[in-house]
Curated annotation (Swiss-Prot):
Source organism of the structure: Priestia megaterium
Gene, per the UniProt record: cbiW
Keywords: 2Fe-2S, Electron transport, Iron, Iron-sulfur, Metal-binding, Transport
Molecular function via GO: 2 iron, 2 sulfur cluster binding; metal ion binding
SUPFAM superfamilies (alphabetical): Thioredoxin-like (SSF52833)
Protein name: Putative 2Fe-2S ferredoxin
Cofactor note: Binds 1 [2Fe-2S] cluster.
Length: 127
């Protein structure tokens, strides 16, 4: 069995692409391939690493998260996936209209005018 261990020195972005069951039913595989193909097309392979995972935002499926900026994207279609690579990864500009969360040094916050659901609190109350 072969095990892959990537050397990520020099990597500028890590994109976590949701491939959980909800995301897969809503185009997660297509979004994954669109991101990876556009990264290759723009010769960004050395700067961008992608990982398939479940991001826990099923209502916003499919979801992609870009680090180090901490931007969470919702409903990533092939078109949005291409824009994430072209405008965010290559161009440095977030797609504000597609954000669920962005990072502001205090933590993740929902952008103004977000239509995404708030979700379930991760911290259990003592009540």
């Amino acid at each position: 069995m072969s095990v892959t261990t990537w050397n990520l020195n020099g990597t500028k972005h890590h994109v976590l692409i949701c491939n959980g069951s909800s995301c897969m039913r809503k185009g997660g595989e297509e979004a994954t391939q669109a991101i990876r193909n556009k990264v290759a097309e723009l010769n960004l392979d050395e700067a961008v690493h992608t990982t398939r995972t479940c991001n826990g935002r099923c209502k916003d499926a499919p979801v992609a998260i870009v680090y180090p900026s901490g931007d969470w994207y919702k409903q990533v279609t092939e078109k949005v996936a291409h824009r994430i690579v072209e405008e965010h990864l290559a161009g440095g500009c977030s797609l504000k209209e597609s954000l669920i969360y962005e990072y502001d040094q205090k933590g993740f916050v929902s952008p103004e005018n977000s239509d995404s659901i708030e979700g379930i609190d991760k911290v259990k109350s003592n009540a």
